[in-house]
Amino acid sequence: MELPNQHKQTAAEGFVSFLNWLCNPWRRQRTVNAAVAFQKDLLAIEDSEHLDDINECFEESAGAQSQRTKVVADGAYAPAKSNRTRRVRKQKKHKFVKYLVNEARAEFGLPKPTEANRLMVQHFLLRVCKDWGVVTAHVHGNVALALPLVFIPTEDDLLSRALMNTHATRAAVRGMDNVQGEGWWNNRLGIGGQVGLAFRSKXGCLERRPGFSTSVSRGEHPDLVVIPSGRPEKQRQLLRYSGIGGHLLIGIHNNSLSNLRRGLMERVFYVEGPNGLQDAPKPVKGAFRTLDKFRDLYTKNSWRHTPVTSEQFLMNYTGRKLTIYREAVDSLSHQPLSSRDAKLKTFVKAEKLNLSKKPDPAPRVIQPRSPRYNVCLGRYLRHYEHHAFKTIAKCFGEITVFKGFTLEQQGEIMRSKWNKYVNPVAVGLDASRFDQHVSVEALEYEHEFYLRDYPNDKQLKWLLKQQLCNVGTAFASDGIIKYKKKGCRMSGDMNTSLGNCILMCAMVYGLKEHLNINLSLANNGDDCVIVCEKADLKKLTSSIEPYFKQFGFKMEVEKPVDIFERIEFCQTQPVFDGSQYIMVRKPSVVTSKDVTSLIPCQTKAQYAEWLQAVGECGMSINGGIPVMQNFYQKLQTGIRRTKFTKTGEFQTNGLGYHSRYMHRVARVPSPETRLSFYLAFGITPDLQEALEIFYDTHKLELDDVIPTDTYQVSGEHLINGLPN
């Protein structure tokens, strides 16, 4: 009886499956034998240190590589130019694989065989192949062979482990018990048992650190007069928990006469030159007229505005600021604004200083005008700011100013800029003391944007004119300083942030037009990152310094990065959380600053409440981020929050501001997140887990306040030395 065709096909497939089953053990054994032979050949190869020896592994590709493409718009593709022209010679494959393994082991040692570590090592090996220009067709095969070998212990690894388990090692470790603590002293006296008592260090404690005044006094200026009062200077204080934070030394400037003088001299009147202090550079005559195209485009995308009422302006504030501005509004109702209200009342900014980076930095000064002046100008520009940022976005064709966005939104915006380019690279612009370089010409150019949107408004014109020539008094507990300064951005003005954004965006737009290249700008005032094609990088970086110099600004180019996570913007870097990118603050900095309080905590209970607030805010922006979520979990003391941390200064500082619209919660970081965190901050997945264990097992002790000159060694050395 003949079988139907369907049954014949089923029988044939079954027979093939049976043959495959019979052959599988043979195939597996053949693969194992090949792996053993490959590993044996690899061990027989001598390690190479000379690049020439590695170069002999390659040959230049005779033909063109397959064309790679990348989506640059909906339905549009662009060719991706590649410099990968080297093929790995077949007879030298073992040597190149061993080179890859040695490079990875030199970078990571013997990592644990986890998925996060596998992704990290794989990324590193792919980067090495890219740096050597290996053609894409040869990358996968070599990386696939090198990757597992990185996790296999060598004879030296086994010997190292064995050394820790010898009789001599154990005897030496036991001997340490008798040279510590009371046991050592008893043994020296010949009394008591021959057993040492190890010292137990405290897990951490509270530390009060007083503010300081600079010992530097440089320069003279005829428009600056110092008038000492003879009274002693008042001390500012920081309260810090030592034992869980980072290794950085954090300090604060006192509002003293010496600090005021140095701050005004070095941050208002003069800039650093090759031979010491000198006047800030002046813009080339007519330079800002070259930026008229951006101003006209801005005006075209904007519209006429009218000032808001005083009550509408007050709705932007709460707490102490609301009280101050309400009193100013009341006084304006029976006493009109005058030129006296435009005078500056200057003081030293109270901020956390990284003294590990700069032991004695020039103090920063805040130069506000009277609240009455701020109310009048704020009625024009406080609500106008958000409109201005949207208009700038229209000019660039994308979101450009990051102010007002959450850290999650900023991460996604930055990623969208990165994805626009086939071979992207990011360049940070370091504006050296931007406010100080804002000339009269720069201010007048900025003011044109406002005056065009408030046409024929005489009061706004008068208010802005007061910023061109500044008269002020700096107040300290031990004296005052009277001074005059033409031009320069006054840091307390209502339009400081908005004005800096407009100026920087205008200049970068002009640079883009001047070079005729495509670029994307991420801006937050004087903090900027430019993303462009790698092919345009040299043209861009060589033009930045001379281009900005013609406008009177000193601009330095930071090291370009071609790894997305390495972008540094406003002291944050992007990290992938498993579903999206989020901007994350630097662990090496925030673990020191976020356990240091500027708010005067009078009792340990208040400081414990402050730590609880920091922990809650930190968790809301770092949930799911390795290391950081464990750090902020530990800061949560369980103390119920009161008005002390729910209102006032805490809600307006950086951490409180960033956490307002974010509600992240703790979750286990994915391997992809650990890889991204490593790429951003250089902390390997193994070290991430070690830090997390340290934070999870640490006990907060808020019992004592120790002298400020006491340095307590703790687990903070785990973070010391990590890349910034």
From Swiss-Prot:
Q: Which GO terms describe its molecular function?
A: nucleotide binding; RNA binding; RNA-directed RNA polymerase activity
Q: Catalysed reaction per UniProt?
A: RNA(n) + a ribonucleoside 5'-triphosphate = RNA(n+1) + diphosphate
Please give the biological process terms from Gene Ontology that the record holds: viral RNA genome replication
Record carries keyword Mitochondrion: no
Arranged from A to Z, the UniProt key words for this protein are: Nucleotide-binding, Nucleotidyltransferase, RNA suppression of termination, RNA-directed RNA polymerase, Transferase, Viral RNA replication
- EC number(s) given by UniProt: 2.7.7.48
Q: Locate the RdRp catalytic domain: which residues?
A: 424-540
The protein's superkingdom reads Viruses
CDD domains found in the cross-reference section: Alphanecrovirus_RdRp
User: Note on file?
Assistant: Readthrough of the terminator UAG occurs at position 203.
What the record says about family reads: Belongs to the tombusviridae RNA polymerase family.
Purpose: RNA-dependent RNA polymerase that plays an essential role in the virus replication.
Provide the protein name: RNA-directed RNA polymerase
Q: Which organism was this protein described from?
A: Tobacco necrosis virus (strain A) (TNV-A)
**What lineage does the source organism belong to?**
Viruses, Riboviria, Orthornavirae, Kitrinoviricota, Tolucaviricetes
